[in-house]
Design a protein with these regions (language model features):
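Conserved glycine-rich cofactor-binding loop
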Residues: 12-13
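The beta1-alpha1 cofactor-binding region of Rossmann-like NAD(H)/NADP(H)-dependent oxidoreductases
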Residues: 53-63, 96
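Active-site loop immediately N-terminal to the catalytic Tyr-X3-Lys motif
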Residues: 92, 139-145
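Active-site helix of classical SDR
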Residues: 114, 150
Length: 165
């Protein structure tokens, strides 16, 4: 039986890291991805397949998808979007560029990644997209405005995608 392949973003620590190891132990072909080369090397040394990918870089995303599809021979069972980061501080003190950076990682990068894997999933007639957002996409917290906003946007985007698929 062929192993099911799952691509997980944001695996350098936390939920992505833990899920990657747990799914690997359950005999999934896990392809992890991280932004930093040192994290990629660390995960590889732990026995996981890991590729470098930066959600703020369109070329990096495209290369990561191409490498993922090569590794799984075009048969991707699931995409687990988890990679994100959060800025703290009052909204009135937040420069527009900082807000744009937050959305580049937490919304636009996820959008591009999903748009690039969907054709493969459609071709194979199946696929799953798991979006690990945050409770802060439903209930705001002060001094987390940039993160809150990106997660609220992601929740709306994900609900719309679900309806369209």
């Amino acid at each position: 039986m062929t192993k099911k392949t799952i691509l997980i973003t944001g695996c350098s620590s936390g939920i992505g890291y833990t899920c990657a190891h747990a799914l690997h132990k359950q005999n999934y072909q896990v392809i992890t991805s991280c932004r930093n080369k040192k994290d990629v090397e660390r995960l590889q040394s732990e026995g996981l397949t890991c590729i470098e990918r930066d959600l703020t870089d369109k070329t990096s995303i495209s290369l990561a998808v191409a490498e993922t599809m090569r590794l799984c021979q075009g048969n991707l069972y699931a995409l687990f979007n988890n990679g994100a980061y959060g800025q703290t501080g009052a909204l009135e003190d937040l420069p527009v560029d900082a807000l744009k950076e937050q959305f580049e990682t937490n919304v636009f990068g996820w959008h591009q990644l999903v748009c690039e894997v969907l054709p493969y999933m459609r071709k194979q007639g199946q696929g799953r997209i798991i979006q690990n957002s945050s409770v802060l996409g439903f209930a705001a917290m002060k001094y987390r405005g940039a993160y809150n906003s990106s997660k609220f946007a992601l929740e709306g985007w994900t609900d719309t995608l679900r309806l369209e698929l």
